[in-house]
């Protein structure tokens, strides 16, 4: 009889849970039983482990194996438990040295096994290693291709392997000469690959490329400085998409905590490239208007994966041709816009992901796109226009802080092309405004004006004088603003004050904020 224990990690959202992998081997009818709420991928690991260990010369014989994944009431997902299962089986079968027992129980193993015993990377290595370090685990063993990602976690003691046979030899086990030669061949073949080193991101498009559109450029700057949601309405070809794609170029780099969270989300989604290192730039996600709810919000079979709203965390979600998106997809944005989180329930479990993104919408003024265009006559009826914008519900639009009209470019604008400010110059003002907001909001849970609660803004610490309050109440009574709209105007006003580097609100700030909020182009 043999008993061995190793450690693994399973993920629920971004939260990693340490899993005890206990293997028990006794004489009897050959069998391999896996218990402890494994999902399909984990159940299939029995065959991968069996094949991988057979390449190391481990035969089952007349042994009955039982592997328990503890805690038993936590659903285990993914193929990342393969390596821990294999080491537990080897320990239970007595194929490792005597000193291995203590090491196995203090080490987390993260990796998928190939049928030849090779070790491959899996999704979610970064948050898994974070969970292991937080639990005080001494060592984390990962696939060689995941080493760069695992080493992004401070304090992680990472060991990288290419073949399970390397661990057999490390823990005092013996391999036949033929197996040892095969392991060495696989290891050397992988060593010939170029090492993964961080590469520079491609240069972001510059705001200086935009011709004209001074009002839209100002709206973009205000949105960047305060983290406000933005909607641009205008005929085709006026530069709406061009402006939106340049918003990331004027946003400050991510703080360390946010960079780790964003990188973890991309790792869980399986789209993180370790060659680029930690993601330090605000991400940009621009789903097509045919995208489904699962693609935008998150979902999938089994445990849900993050969608575009989470992959845009601390960055920007750009919906071009916004009225073309399905109403269901657009309405699903309301919860994350308000809370900065998205919770997805499935039969296989529940997952919560951060989703504090900046929403940017772009739309034509009508289905034909000619309304507002110079020298163009709109052919749409009023009913067609209403239907076109009907998917953009009132509650969603009420959460958009800024609405700006992007008009047709004139010949004079084209003649002065290239004279606009660069992204670097605008980004400098944005950083200065954000620092001013951070100083003012010191001691509060908020960093950006767009995050500040309405009760705080309207309270004694919000800096709202009686004349400013009367101006807002007048707009509220006229029906120009909802109560949520009042709060959003105040957030915009403080951003305008921060851009001017002043400590108090003035009527001019409220007036400009009202103009940005209640533009006549709002559908």
Residue ranges and their predicted role:
Residues 138, 228-229, 313-317, 339-342, ...:
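Loop/turn-to-beta-strand initiation segments
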Residues 232-273, 339:
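Walker A/P-loop
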Residues 314, 320-321, 332:
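Walker B catalytic acidic pair
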Residues 234, 298, 321:
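The Walker A (P-loop) glycine that initiates the GxxxxGKT/S ATP-binding motif of P-loop NTPases
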Residues 60-63, 103-104, 136, 154-155, ...:
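Short loop/turn elements that form and flank the Walker-type P-loop nucleotide-binding site
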Residues 1-231, 235, 241, 345, ...:
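Peripheral, non-AAA+ core regions of ATP-driven protein-machinery
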Residues 221, 277, 282-283, 294-317, ...:
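Conserved alpha-helical scaffold flanking the Walker A/P-loop in AAA+ ATPase domains
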Residues 35-46, 61, 68-78, 304, ...:
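Basic, amphipathic alpha-helical bundle interface domains used for macromolecular binding and assembly
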């Amino acid at each position: 009889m043999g008993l061995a224990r190793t450690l693994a990690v399973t993920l629920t959202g971004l939260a990693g849970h340490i899993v005890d992998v206990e293997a028990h081997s006794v004489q009897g009818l050959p069998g391999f039983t896996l218990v402890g709420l494994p999902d399909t991928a984990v159940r299939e690991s029995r065959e991968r482990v069996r094949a991988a260990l057979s390449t190391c010369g481990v035969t089952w014989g007349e042994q009955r194996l039982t592997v328990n994944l503890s805690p038993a009431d936590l659903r285990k997902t993914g193929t990342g438990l393969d390596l821990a299962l294999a080491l537990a089986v080897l320990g239970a079968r007595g194929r490792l040295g005597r000193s291995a027992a203590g090491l196995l129980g203090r080490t987390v193993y993260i990796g998928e096994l190939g049928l030849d015993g090779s070790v491959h990377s899996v999704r979610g290595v970064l948050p898994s290693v974070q969970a292991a370090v937080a639990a005080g685990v001494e060592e984390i063993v990962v696939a060689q291709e995941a080493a760069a990602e695992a080493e992004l976690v401070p304090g992680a003691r990472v060991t990288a392997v290419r073949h399970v046979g390397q661990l057999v030899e490390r823990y005092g086990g013996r391999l036949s000469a033929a197996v040892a030669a095969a392991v060495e061949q696989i290891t050397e073949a992988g060593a010939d690959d170029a090492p993964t080193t961080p590469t520079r991101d491609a240069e972001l498009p510059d705001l200086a490329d935009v011709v004209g559109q001074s009002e839209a450029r100002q709206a973009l700057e205000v949105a960047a400085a305060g983290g406000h949601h933005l909607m641009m309405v205008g005929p085709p070809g006026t530069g709406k998409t061009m402006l939106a794609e340049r918003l990331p170029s004027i946003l400050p780099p991510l703080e360390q905590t946010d960079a780790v969270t964003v990188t973890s989300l991309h790792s869980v989604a399986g789209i993180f490239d370790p060659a680029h290192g930690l993601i330090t730039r605000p991400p940009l996600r621009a789903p097509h208007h045919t995208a489904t709810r699962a693609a935008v919000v998150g979902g999938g079979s089994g445990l849900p994966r993050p969608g575009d709203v989470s992959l845009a965390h601390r960055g920007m979600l750009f919906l071009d041709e916004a009225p073309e998106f399905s109403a269901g997809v657009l309405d699903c944005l309301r919860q994350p816009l308000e809370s900065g989180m998205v919770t997805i329930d499935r039969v296989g479990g529940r997952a919560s992901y951060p989703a504090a993104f900046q929403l940017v919408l772009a739309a034509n003024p009508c289905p034909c796109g000619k309304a507002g265009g110079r020298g163009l006559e709109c052919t749409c009826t009023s009913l067609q226009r209403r239907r076109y914008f009907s998917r953009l519900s009132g509650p969603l639009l009420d959460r958009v802080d800024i609405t700006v009209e992007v008009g047709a470019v004139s010949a004079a604008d084209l003649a002065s092309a290239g004279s606009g400010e660069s992204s670097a110059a605008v980004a400098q003002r944005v950083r200065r405004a954000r620092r001013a907001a951070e100083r003012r909001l010191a001691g509060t849970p908020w960093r950006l004006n767009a995050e500040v609660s309405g009760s705080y803004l309207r309270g004694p610490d919000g800096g709202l004088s009686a004349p400013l309050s009367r101006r807002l109440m007048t707009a509220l009574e006229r029906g120009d603003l909802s109560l949520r709209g009042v709060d959003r105007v105040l957030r915009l006003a403080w951003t305008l004050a921060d851009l001017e580097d002043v400590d108090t609100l003035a009527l001019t700030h409220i007036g400009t904020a009202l103009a940005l909020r209640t533009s006549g182009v709002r559908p």
